[in-house]
């Protein structure tokens, strides 16, 4: 073996890394052993030899591992194929339907209500020969600006809603007698009498006008109604749950019962039947014993409960009152409270610390509490006659809670029924239009919210029912207008509280990202790294393939 070949083999074994050095000065030992020029020539020979040997080794390894690499690539490819096939399935199963909605009509619904919600009560003056006074009154009505949402009309012929009866008297006064509007007035000329009649009509209808106005201002951002009547009325709904509860104090050790069925039949059902066309009232009853008594103090040898202690009393009683499972059915509570004998007779005080004669307190948007001073040792049953006066108070409170603000009696006259009918129509239309506007804002603000076909159908039904209600009002058909307005309210509520929309609100896009990231990040990162590695291997194999196809020099 020649010294040159021996030296080459020695350097390959001991100093293999020298062949990769680009600068000759780094090969310090070789330069001083055989000289600079010979070392340079020798290193070039070694470098080509090493590269040739490494390519041979890689080619041999590639040939040996080719089946294994192919299997590895097929396995990796299968993962990507599964992912690509799963994407359409995932998209189909998680994609939400977003139907188009008439946003312009929904956003303009409140202003449309203010424009089209017009009540037109009609009158006829009795004993008006030649209809001269009727024409004068109609002229005055047309000359004066109409009050908000009301357009009074005086007609010459029937049918009309009300009749005006003029009676000569020294004093001016007016009052209702069923559908007759009676005016006692001194003798005047036609022009003066026409102005007087119009003033009396607007004075009679001003409470109704204020009630409708308060409904509109409740949804206004600039005007906030401060009327106590507005704050007292219960939340609007086509149906209510009326809960009659007899709560017996903890000091009463004798069982007390009441003849509630006969009492309801005699004293409460007539009013419920009159209200049936306006709202459905579902009556329930209960008796609760050993109820914690109210806080009482002695005043003039009487036990009294302060007005400031009533909130605590209500909170205490609510523990014993059953709740309705229906969210859209507000509950009106009427509590008859029998205190313990130790604090009887117990009287409730008003805000001025005066004893309330009826011993009953009306609580806004909740109901009322009535205290019954009942000697249990002498009598253990409340007969229907004993409950008569209490039901008179309950009936009056029910009308107040439903929105009839100046109720003189506990019954519902024809005039009060019409008044409440108009009020319910206004409430239904205003609530439905406000719900549509809120729904439009909600859908606009949440682009990922699902809007199924059902919601689209509910919205269209609401708009159609509102239009039909306005048309019925223009024809002065209150019963038909109430039916359409109630349907509009129900459909709007079903659209706003649709289950698909509620779930979307509680599961926004941020929650989806929080769920997907922990699941797919640990899978995708190794797949991505493996993909990059396989790409590098494929590029290296192509390079080796090109080198292998280069012809060797002879």
Curated annotation (Swiss-Prot):
Domain of life the protein comes from: Eukaryota
Pfam family, one: PIG-S
Record-annotated membrane-spanning stretches: 74-94, 512-532
Carbohydrate attachment residues: 132, 375
Pathway: Glycolipid biosynthesis; glycosylphosphatidylinositol-anchor biosynthesis
Topology feature Lumenal, residues: 95-511
Coiled coil: none
Binding partners and assembly: Forms a complex with PIG-T homolog, PIG-U homolog and GPI8.
Family listed: Belongs to the PIGS family.
Protein name: GPI transamidase component PIG-S homolog
Organism, as annotated: Schizosaccharomyces pombe (strain 972 / ATCC 24843)
Gene: gpi17
